[in-house]
């Protein structure tokens, strides 16, 4: 048994300059596990609750001292002495201690930081890399990355309605080569935007945030950059979108302000289907609002056999909501964000629920990130085959990519790169 002897929480700063929670879990052996939690900008209404202090005199009300206090007192008392290797028991203890459906009493940020730090301590104690500790000794594949190189919506101050335009280097032979392709396209795009007098400042996730005449213009610039970097769109590099449609869904209509359009669910499904026919788009996240299940069903029936339709705000990493979506034939993929649900055990349950139903699972960062690389290990440990962790700039994004490079190197011939196999449920 590897007993927990102390837990120390602190308030640190995330990539947006906002406070977040970091936790150290100390074991009897002297081993320490450390983890820090992320925070989102566009959030689903059913996400687990991130506890903020609301004190306007500190960090504009975004302090997390109460969450830190909850860890250092109540949570510590509840799990000191427990075996750190009993992850599911620890997580259930935290859930029961909180006692609410959405972790609003103690805070999902407090609970998740402890859950992740316990896993890190247990891995260290076992002498295993985190991905091996979490995933066992079986065959593991490196995930195909979805790289957000043009930011819009809630992630940027610009005229683009949709939140993310991504490149997916699925046609490359290794993760290392996929990462290189992504970086080369990123630099080619910067050069193109600069030559046209467009801004090359970056958004929260490290992608460029230029003012463009339309949402479609973002796709066209990216295709130009792929070609300029010496790659072939559709063969080497595919495209992905995160519409974050809940952000512009009002009164039953989709308001694309940059184009002066107000579309019904059926019209917006047509709009997206036209793009899918025209461009090598393989993945669309939150193509409809979380409040528009009928629209989701319409979109799934329309293009769900040839495009990955990822539920983020829709499913909020919640196995119960995902099961409802599976039953109703809504979407064919789930985005996995550890802080939407609040423990590692519940995160893994959602991933398994997706896989059993033939849905894909995409491991994801948040727009407010830290240097914590746990999600990189989770993507390999669970054989999720896809990861979404930002652009090719900003260290909090690159930290995850660099961890995946290390994992690929460690596994050597005992691994392969998922590539286009990541989209196993498409025809």
From Swiss-Prot:
It is found in: Cytoplasm; Secreted; Cell surface. One of its GO terms (molecular function) is magnesium ion binding. It catalyses: (2R)-2-phosphoglycerate = phosphoenolpyruvate + H2O. Disulfide bonds: none annotated. GO terms for cellular component: cell surface; extracellular region; phosphopyruvate hydratase complex. Its EC number is 4.2.1.11. Pathway: Carbohydrate degradation; glycolysis; pyruvate from D-glyceraldehyde 3-phosphate: step 4/5. Keywords: Cytoplasm, Glycolysis, Lyase, Magnesium, Metal-binding, Secreted. (2R)-2-phosphoglycerate binds at residues 163, 337, 366-367, 388. InterPro entries: Enolase, Enolase-like_C_sf, Enolase-like_N, Enolase_C, Enolase_CS, Enolase_N. PROSITE patterns: ENOLASE. It is an enzyme of class 4 (lyase). Coiled coil: none annotated. Mg(2+) binds at residues 242, 285, 312. One of its GO terms (biological process) is glycolytic process. Its cofactor is Mg(2+). Binds a second Mg(2+) ion via substrate during catalysis. The active site is at 205 (proton donor), 337 (proton acceptor). Belongs to the enolase family. Catalyzes the reversible conversion of 2-phosphoglycerate (2-PG) into phosphoenolpyruvate (PEP). It is essential for the degradation of carbohydrates via glycolysis. This is Enolase. It comes from Methylobacillus flagellatus (strain ATCC 51484 / DSM 6875 / VKM B-1610 / KT). The lineage of its organism: Bacteria, Pseudomonadati, Pseudomonadota, Betaproteobacteria, Nitrosomonadales.
